[in-house]
Design a protein with these regions (language model features):
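N-terminal redox-cofactor-binding region of secreted/periplasmic oxidoreductases
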Residues: 2-616
Length: 616
């Protein structure tokens, strides 16, 4: 379907009119105090905050373009049609190495290649993890990185203006105190819901998932109607480029260069230690170097930050030498500790007449009506995102005996390996989480088809997506070549721990339990994925291996942890062994969380900006 969008209303937003510059030579000639590598979610937050001081000159190097008036980015529901992810115009189009535990399948790994980064192409869910999960970061040796230390910065980034409708319906009062109301990113709730959404919620509760009316409080266990990053006044996606960048673009001390790829952090050994002096980058096939007087801040993301560190001589010396790069700083944790949320999606055909998102795809009349409603009222189906989700513990999906077997199998496998010091500490924490009422599995209702395909013509579906939140499998990212423009080798090592597969198998069974529960069951015809004849554990194991995908939440490849544990950055986000090189993106997250990541990363970036300001 064609998504049209008039942007005349942008004049009403009160935003600045500055735009990125288009000359690499001009950028390189400027003098900067700070250079931010990567104009994604975190990078734009940091650049915006640092440039609040008019005496500080801030440069941003971004590989993508600024898609200011692009309806595929700005219209919330457009992302469901998968026009953005793995589209080379907007996406790096990265992929995993063949996964040996997935029958050598190669898994697509979308990452936003645009000003705003992945906040420009994400599915917009705007939620938080639990207090226990954030507190675990501090348990790993990162003082001040806990729920209490991060919550004020998450709130600083966000602006809620309305109460979640289900919460309001049970008369639980005003906007919760744990939600921010003065920030730039609009947190809001869908005003349009497809027909199966509320019957699904009732079925999930009957299946044993408790309702949660305050999931932002630090306890996110239960079924909830999550917020999305959507501006309900304009009907537009609210993301880093049209908020943080737009609010700061008029500043003469903030300079953003787009379509430029950083190739190396220029490092020198000084009397203070290894010091970042600038950044080399390629812009329209020419190489330039820009200099930074104070700091270089690396915000290239989980998949590309470790590559740039290694290209600059920071990492495992053996990896660097293999590609002819002289080691400048031995830091074996670079590129390690890769963690991701992996999922399988069960799909169910719904009865004729039941409205889901699929009808917009195959029903021209429904598509035209949705577009007309969006154009006239900035409301309706085109503003709706997936929001009905649950975080559940293992006891929802498996009995005590089966969970006990999972534990024993896990420790048998760990005993045969040589886990890193960081992994040993992580596994101790994760093992405790398996026994707690915590979100070990996320259950997402997608009111449409989200299977491996193909869907039947002129047919509507719902999908129940089951996603592991605390995987035990660990992967890595390292150089594939000394060519800085070549992608790195990304090996997530999915299902290298049997427990991850066991959890997904039991999760499929639980999805079926919800689907067979009233009042949802009467709306469904049959299960399509996996096919109804897939019943035994053996068959389910095969299906899981063949159908695993990722929810696109990679973290951990420049982990914040003490160097003795294999960490890459310290609690001030400085790379161990350097004087002024910091990392600010999801790669610093040491352990995964039961949440979608954008809200946490906004908080990390706000906290990082405060740390940097306080150092000068």
């Amino acid at each position: 379907m064609k998504l049209a969008l008039s942007f005349s209303l942008l004049a009403c937003l009160g935003v600045a009119t500055g735009t990125p510059i288009s000359s690499g030579a001009e950028f390189a000639e400027k003098e900067f105090d700070y250079i931010v590598v990567g104009g994604g979610l975190a990078g734009l937050v940091v650049a915006s905050r640092l440039s609040e001081n008019s005496k500080m000159r801030v440069g941003v190097i971004e590989a993508g373009r600024f898609f200011e008036d692009d309806p595929l980015i700005n219209t919330p529901a457009a992302v469901r049609n998968r026009f953005l992810q793995m589209n080379a115009t907007y996406d790096w189009r990265l992929s995993s190495a063949p996964q040996k535990h997935l029958n050598n399948r190669v898994i697509p790994l979308p990452r936003g290649k645009a000003l705003g980064g992945s906040s420009a192409i994400s599915l917009l869910i705007f939620n938080r993890g639990s207090k226990n999960e954030y507190d675990a970061w501090e348990r790993l040796g990162n003082h001040g990185w806990n729920w209490g230390g991060l919550l004020p910065f998450m709130k600083k980034a966000e602006r809620f203006e309305s109460v979640e409708p289900i919460r309001a319906a049970v008369e639980l009062g005003e906007i919760p105190a744990d939600q921010g109301t003065g920030g730039l990113i609009a947190g809001s709730y869908n005003t349009f819901y497809y027909e199966p959404v509320f019957p699904y919620r009732a079925a999930a509760i009957k299946a044993g998932i408790p309702p949660n009316y305050d999931p932002d409080s630090g306890v996110n266990h239960g079924v909830q109607n999550a917020a999305t990053s959507t501006n309900r006044t304009t009907g537009l996606r609210s993301y880093a480029a049209n908020t943080y960048y737009r609010s700061a673009a008029h500043r003469s001390n903030l300079v953003v260069l787009t379509e430029a790829q950083a190739t190396k952090i220029e490092l020198e050994q000084t009397k203070e230690g290894l010091t970042a002096k600038g950044v080399s980058f390629v812009h329209h096939n020419k190489t330039f170097t820009a200099k930074a007087k104070k700091e270089v801040i690396l915000s290239a993301g989980t998949l590309l930050t470790p590559q740039l560190l290694e290209l600059s001589g920071i990492g495992n010396g053996e990896v660097l030498k293999k590609h002819g790069i002289a080691p400048k700083l031995e830091l074996s944790g670079v590129g390690e500790n890769y963690q991701d949320h992996i999922l399988v999606s069960t799909t169910y055909e719904v009865k004729p007449g039941v409205s889901t998102y699929d009808s917009i795809n195959w029903n021209a009349t429904a598509a035209a009506q949705a577009q007309a409603q969006y154009d006239s009222k900035r409301d309706g189906p085109l503003t709706a995102s997936n929001s009905l989700l649950s975080y559940i513990d293992l006891y929802h999906i498996a009995g005590s005996a089966k969970i006990g077997y999972m534990h024993r199998k896990l420790w048998e496998e760990v005993a045969k390996e040589k886990p890193t010091a960081l992994q040993k500490e992580q596994y101790k924490i994760q093992e405790l989480w398996l026994r707690k009422k915590m979100g070990n599995v996320e259950v997402i209702l997608h009111p449409g088809y989200f299977g491996a395909g193909p869907a039947k013509n002129n047919t509507s579906y719902i999908s129940i997506i089951m996603c592991i939140q605390h995987p035990f499998s660990r992967g890595n990212i390292h150089l594939n070549s000394s060519n800085p423009l070549a992608p790195p080798t990304i090996d997530p090592n999915y299902l290298s721990k049997t427990i991850d597969q066991q959890i997904l198998v039991e999760s499929v069974k639980f999805a079926d339990k919800i689907a067979k529960t009233n009042p949802l069951a009467p709306m469904l015809v049959t299960r399509q994925d996996p096919s109804p004849d897939v019943k035994s554990d053996e068959d389910l194991n095969t299906w899981v291996r063949d159908n695993i995908r990722t929810l696109h939440h990679p973290i951990g490849t420049a982990a914040m942890a003490p160097k003795s544990l294999g960490g890459v950055v310290d609690e001030k986000l400085k790379v161990h062994g350097t004087t002024n090189l910091r990392v600010v993106d999801a790669s610093i997250i040491p352990m995964h969380l039961a949440t979608h990541l954008q809200r946490t990363i906004y908080g990390i970036a706000e906290k990082a900006a405060e740390i940097i300001k306080n150092d000068y």
